[in-house]
Swiss-Prot record, chain A:
HAMAP family: ChlB_BchB (MF_00353). The keyword Transcription regulation does not apply. Transmembrane segments: none annotated. It comes from Prochlorococcus marinus (strain AS9601). The keyword Nucleus does not apply. This is Light-independent protochlorophyllide reductase subunit B.
From Swiss-Prot, chain B:
HAMAP family: ChlN_BchN (MF_00352). PANTHER family: LIGHT-INDEPENDENT PROTOCHLOROPHYLLIDE REDUCTASE SUBUNIT N (PTHR39429:SF3). [4Fe-4S] cluster binds at C17, C42, C103. GO terms for molecular function: 4 iron, 4 sulfur cluster binding; ATP binding; metal ion binding; oxidoreductase activity, acting on iron-sulfur proteins as donors; oxidoreductase activity, acting on the CH-CH group of donors, iron-sulfur protein as acceptor. InterPro entries: LIPOR_BchN/ChlN, Nase/OxRdtase_comp1, Protochl_reductN. It comes from Prochlorococcus marinus (strain AS9601). Its EC number is 1.3.7.7. It catalyses: chlorophyllide a + oxidized 2[4Fe-4S]-[ferredoxin] + 2 ADP + 2 phosphate = protochlorophyllide a + reduced 2[4Fe-4S]-[ferredoxin] + 2 ATP + 2 H2O. This is Light-independent protochlorophyllide reductase subunit N.
Length: 523, 418
């Protein structure tokens, strides 16, 4: 048993949902109790998706357990197929269903449908979300392409020359609930096309089962998010000889290296290096005199393997920071993260426990934290500025504007996102100067200085004001008590309104009743 | 009973499980800790349902079952022991520890009652252990609170003192208001269950008169009855009508003159009516579809129809206790269609067909419906916002008028979503 107060990754079937929801013409029947439907909100709320995930839950209940849950599974599969008419069906189970061993995948296969069925076995008690996503994508690729394995010969990365067309690549790994995947794909496609390279298929994001069957029309695969795509890339390499890339194009140096790698694999001549370096503002912004203050800033990094490693490299080599902590929750990437940490002379932190991360953060005493949503909270508690660089994320980490992490524009975004929290030093100053101003009730603080002392100061000054309102109106005990119960972000408004009301009505003392009267009056 | 149309539906659902109640229960009783014995899914659920709004170390957690725990139950018990020891060492301020069962722990028949019993002996005088199930194979959303409260009843001492016991978690400010009003009515011995501290459980007995504040407490009510408490039958204190009836029912149980109640409530009522006007203007004549989630749906439908003049297309509820809801159902308009249970696909078909102005639904469904041009309101907000009582009637209406108002401001109906 593992005690968890907060988890970085969901269960493996949530990973499977990420693949299913990323794609078209796919449906996933998930043998699960009703409560597991919460997972839908990850997509419809964090990602603000306008469609429900293509998932049908069997919703078995305790009273079904004695009877025939297998029948319930079949009924739900039948209904889902009739209603959604998917081109490919995924069938799997969540943690509870795994225990009752109905084997829904096998049941589905016995039902005589003519579409491909992928039977997902994702051990819920030993594996997690990213593994589940990777396994699902791999099983899907395998199922849809396995018939073509024997008939096809190995794919040469130079095939495009023989065929007399531009080289074609697949971009593999982007998925819903991945960090900024949607925009990364646009950026990478743009970069490749500038280099004369066409994109054959992007998957799973936006792909259909037909697209998966077309994967072998490309010369090489771009393994953009190894957490999700590496297993599939390996399989495609083993069975079709397709090469895949290793460099993740996050940061200027990695982007250039990535372009080099692709070019080498495809035997393309490379564009001039200087021109590439000028494609992003990061190098100049980082060099400009204003950035002097960034020198040697101490950063602490924690996230998924891919983003943490990339962040460490950018921090050190492109922004001139000092990396004082590096870690990941992706056990699958532990080896690579350790190697990167060793190069930076820090000890890698491989853990699932956010409290351990918070402790390490406290010890390292950084000036900036680059982490997940959870490190944002920890950093806030410690009063350290933070920027989110990896999942798990918050709805605010899915911005409306174009904001990739990869490629040239990604580097610009990274510069802004990492540096802006630091520049708030001036703002903090101003807030401190003006904190006795009426506007600065306890909700109106900068996102950084969320420390206890700060809040207390503001509360105290607020309280003083409550006692002596300008017009000589007195707040009675009950009135004041009632006012403190109003949420801080509207308290100021409620207070002013109530006083306004009291003056209007010639009420000298504000009680809780006055507050409610005023509330009703202004409603 | 009015001519209400009852329907039952089964099929795929879209409802949280009872674990979700932890989100408000742990805030109500800051000296308690909720330890879910479950899977990574359970951990992920409460974290997602709590939003990512955890500011401090939360007072809930999950002991995640692993492969080796499934192999042998003896080991699972030992492991749980170890986790509890660690937890208590780390959080010495915990006074009550709830061991919360989940689907996996129930399916493998992990006996949390026995575990709790053993731990109670070991930590005697330091921490109390209680257990209940919040599993999704047995409970939905708000029913977790029912389980937690029911589990506390055996710990409540007996007393024959006459008192009013308000049962169900309320926002603190609402609770204070209620107590004040009851005092004005002449009922001064009032206690709340759950209390604000888990260790300050009210004493109960045959002179305890129970007034429910939430409709989802069937099991708790049954056990309180067994302990001799008298259950006051009333609608729920949502809206002016429900709250007035609720106060009246309590007054009657305490033999307080009805006129006095009216005298005390009428200024509150007048002011609430005034406050309600602007919302009513927006809500009037609008068609409302409630999908099942919190069991508050029937009371909400009653309020939104009777006081805000909305038309009810369908009132879904995950579970219906006709006995507890008797007074509410009496107040519903004729021919109200109540649907217990859920087949989410068929229900959504009916939503689309009837094209309502507003749908009350769970968080997973809201954006997809908005994308189809249908305004929505999250039902989870009803359990997080102070909505009870006469003074809150306008706020309650405001929760529903806001999406419609917003819809009027932003005229685009169907949007391309990404
Ligand atoms: S439905 Fe069951 S398995 Fe799922 S989160 Fe709730 S208790 Fe856990
Ligand atoms: S505190 Fe700020 S960052 Fe954290 S969840 Fe709330 S809004 Fe998001």
């Amino acid at each position: 048993m593992e005690l968890t107060l907060w988890t970085y990754e969901g269960p493996p079937h949530v990973g499977a949902m990420r693949i299913a929801s990323s794609m078209k013409d796919i449906h996933y029947v998930l043998h699960a109790p009703q409560g597991d439907t919460y997972a839908d909100l990850l997509f419809t709320m964090i990602e603000r998706r306008g469609q429900r995930p293509p998932v049908t839950y069997t919703t078995f209940q305790a009273r079904d357990l004695g009877g025939d849950t297998a029948e319930l599974v079949k009924k739900n599969i039948k209904e889902a197929v009739e209603r959604f008419k998917p081109k490919t069906l995924l069938v799997g189970e969540s943690c509870t269903a795994e225990l009752i061993q109905d084997q829904p995948g096998a049941l589905a296969k016995g039902m005589g449908f003519d579409m491909p069925i992928v039977n997902l076995e994702l051990p819920a008690y030993s594996k997690k979300e990213n593994w589940g996503a990777s396994e699902t994508f791999y099983q899907l690729t395998r199922t849809l392409l396995k018939e073509k394995v024997s008939s096809s010969e190995k794919i040469s990365p130079l095939r495009w020359k023989e065929l007399g067309r531009r080289p074609k690549v697949n971009i593999l790994g982007p998925s819903l609930l991945g960090f900024r995947c949607r925009d990364d794909v646009i950026e990478i496609q743009r970069i490749l096309s500038e280099q004369g390279i066409d994109t054959n298929v992007v998957a799973p994001l936006g792909a259909s089962p037909d697209d998966i069957e077309r994967l072998i029309d490309a010369e090489i695969n771009i393994c953009l998010y190894p957490e999700i795509a590496e297993a599939s890339c390996e399989w495609l390499k083993r069975n079709f000889g397709m090469e895949y890339t290793n460099t993740i194009p996050i940061g200027i140096k990695n982007t250039i290296e990535f372009i080099n790698e692709v070019h080498k694999k495809l035997d393309l001549p490379l564009t001039n290096k200087e021109e590439l370096e000028n494609k992003s503002k990061l190098p100049w912004y980082s060099k400009s005199v204003d950035s002097n203050y960034l020198t040697g800033k101490r950063v602490f990094i924690f996230g998924d393997g891919t983003h943490a490693i990339a962040a460490a490299k950018i921090a050190k080599e492109e922004l001139g920071f000092e990396v004082v902590g590096l870690g990941t929750y992706s056990r699958e990437m532990a080896r690579q993260v350790r190697a990167t940490a060793k190069d930076l002379n820090v000890e890698a932190l491989i853990t699932n426990n956010y409290l351990e991360v918070e402790d390490a953060m406290k010890k390292a005493a950084p000036e900036l934290v680059l982490g997940t949503q959870m490190e944002r909270h920890s950093a806030k508690r410690l009063g350290i500025p933070c920027s989110v660089i990896s999942t798990p994320m918050h709805v605010q980490d899915v911005p409306a504007r174009y904001s990739p992490q990869m490629g040239w524009e990604g580097a610009n975004v990274i510069f802004d996102d990492w540096v802006h929290p630091l520049m708030m030093g001036l703002e903090e100053h101003l807030i401190d100067m003006f904190k006795h101003d009426f506007e600065f009730v306890d909700g109106h603080q900068s996102h950084l200085g969320h420390t206890a002392t700060n809040t207390n100061n503001i509360l105290n000054s607020d309280e003083k004001k409550e006692k002596n309102s300008k017009e000589g109106i007195i707040w009675t005990e009950s009135g004041r008590a009632e006012l403190t119960k109003v949420p801080f972000f509207v308290r100021g408004k409620v207070k002013t309104n109530t006083e306004k009301y009291a003056i209007l009505r010639g009420i000298p003392e504000i009680s809780d009743e006055t507050l409610y009267d005023a509330k009703a009056y202004f409603n | 009973m009015s001519k209400v149309e009852f329907n039952k539906e089964t099929g795929p659902r879209e409802v949280f499980c009872g674990l979700t109640s932890i989100v408000w229960l742990h805030r109500r009783m800051p000296d308690a800790f909720f330890l879910v014995v479950g899977s990574r899914t359970c951990a992920h659920l409460i974290q997602s349902a709590a939003g990512v709004m955890i500011f401090a170390e939360p007072r809930f957690g999950t002991a995640i079952l692993e492969e080796k725990d499934l192999a042998g139950l003896a080991d699972a018990h030992e492991e749980l022991d170890r986790v509890v020891n660690d937890l208590i060492a780390r959080r010495p301020e915990i006074k009550t520890l709830f061991l919360v069962g989940s689907c996996p722990s129930e399916v493998i028949k992990l006996d949390l009652a026995t575990v709790a019993e053993k731990l109670n002996k070991r930590f005697l005088g330091q921490v109390r252990f209680v257990n209940y199930s919040g599993s999704g194979i047995e409970t939905t959303f708000t029913q977790g609170e029912d389980g937690a409260l029911k589990a506390l009843i055996p710990l409540m001492e007996s007393s024959n003192e006459e008192k009013l016991l308000l049962v169900g978690t309320l926002a603190n400010n609402v609770e204070d208001r209620f107590k004040k009003i009851f005092k004005n009515l002449g009922i001064s011995n009032i206690e709340s269950f759950p209390p604000r501290q888990s260790t300050e459980l009210p004493k109960i007995g045959k002179n305890t008169k129970v007034l429910l504040t939430q409709p989802y407490l069937s099991d708790t009510v049954r056990d309180l009855k067994h302990r001799g408490c008298e259950i006051i039958s009333a609608p729920f204190p949502l809206g002016i009508e429900g709250s007035t009836e609720w106060f009246l029912a309590a007054a009657k149980a305490f033999k307080i003159n009805e006129l006095k109640v009216h005298e005390i409530l009428s200024p509150l009522i007048n002011r609430a009516k005034l406050a309600l006007e602007s919302h009513k203007e927006i809500l009037k004549g609008k068609r409302l579809f409630l999908l099942p989630e919190s069991q508050l749906e029937i009371s909400l439908a009653r309020f939104l129809h009777n006081e805000c003049e909305m038309d009810l297309v369908e009132v879904g509820t995950p579970y219906l206790n006709k006995d507890l809801m008797k007074e509410e159902i009496n107040l519903l308009p004729d021919n109200t269609k109540i649907v217990e249970g859920q087949h989410v696909e068929k229900q959504l078909d009916r939503v689309r067909e009837s094209n309502p102005d507003l749908v009350v639904c769970g968080m997973g469904l809201a954006n997809p419906l908005e994308a189809e041009g249908i305004s929505t309101k999250w039902s989870i907000e009803m359990v997080f916002s102070p909505i009870h009582g006469i003074d809150q009637a306008a706020d309650l209406a405001g929760l529903f008028s806001k999406p419609l108002r917003r819809n009027q401001i932003l005229t685009t109906k169907t949007l391309v979503t990404h």
